[in-house]
Amino acid sequence: IRRERYLNMNFVRTDHLKAGMRLAKPIYHKNGVLLYDRNSVLTEPGIISARNFGLVGVYVLEPAEPVPPLSREDLEFEQLQTVYIFQLRECLDLIAKRKRIEPLPKLLNNIIQHYGALDHRVNFNQNLRSSEDFMYKHAISTAILVSMISSRLHYDHQQQLTLAAAALLYDIGYSHVPKNILDKGSDTLSTSDREVLQHALERGIEPLGMYRSDFDFFPRALALMQAYVYADYPEKLAIMPDEELQGMVKILRVADQFDQMTAMNIGHEPVSEISAMKLLSADATRYDKQIVATLAECIHIVPQAANIDLSTGDKGIVLVENTTNYMRPVILRLGDNKIYDLSSEADFRKIQILDIMKTMDNRISVDEETLKQFVPDEKLKELTAHFRERLQKIHERENTQTAQ
């Protein structure tokens, strides 16, 4: 990992944990109960517990490193991810045993309840993945993303169930993929690696046909999984997907790829959300522009307080997020301590955002201390309020034009 882009938080495998290390992230029980809070000092019993939980490793802080800021919603996001992963493991164990997947509807409804009707953007924080837990974490993250996107596109509950179920189960074939391939980045996969992945995904969905009559949403979800897995091999499909399924495939494809590109992985470094959105937008034939734009309405790409790399060669901090065009917020340029409104053509010609600085666990790096130096200033407060009001008017005007 390129250290200059990240803060000091370190990932340590459970085998290498030592008493006295401080946790950078909380550890939850499978039912969501907090076991160890952030900044907790690890003890020998705690290390044994971490190993018994099946954790690949944990994030620890440097000796003098402060605890990174996290909102209540961010903490709940991590808590729910933990709960969902354990519930998904239970579902996949039942599938492996060819037993009825009783917990599946509850898991799906829980995800949709929390993320399928949001009226605001969220911080899509990622967990570091290994070949051992990639399948579970990727499935959960993809299900959360498709739930948010489908909600913005006004899909009904049954359609959301179909999408979320497909997101959770389409990739169970990854369990058949060798570790050395799973640890690779998508841009380093050989042709033979991709063939192995394709064959594994096809093999994974084969046994799911036995659940067609178990749940009313499952036949449609299975058809979506097949349409997605065989998208590049339509000759293998018994029935071509209808228009609705084709639309769902587009949603699943964007969510799937965005998550894989931005997730931290032991084997390869992720790209930033900005880079991921650029890559998706550049391939409009494969990634639907409307879906990509809708994704940007669901999650923060360039949020307030984020540290940013600028085209001028220095860094800046986002003061006011632009909810209409995330690449054109109001920023504080640290090189000259001046405010620039990138929604202004004059300012945008001078400065553009190149990328975002990230933490080791792929969070947006938030420079709260630097912000504190400027926010109390009355002039800056007035300017920031002015820019926020201006951006809000632009946003409202564009929404009105879209509605017409």
Regions found by a protein language model. Give the residues of each.
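Short, flexible segments with low predicted structural confidence
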Residues: 18-23, 106, 113-114, 121, ...
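Short hydrophobic/aromatic segments of transmembrane alpha-helices and their interfaces
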Residues: 30, 157, 242-243
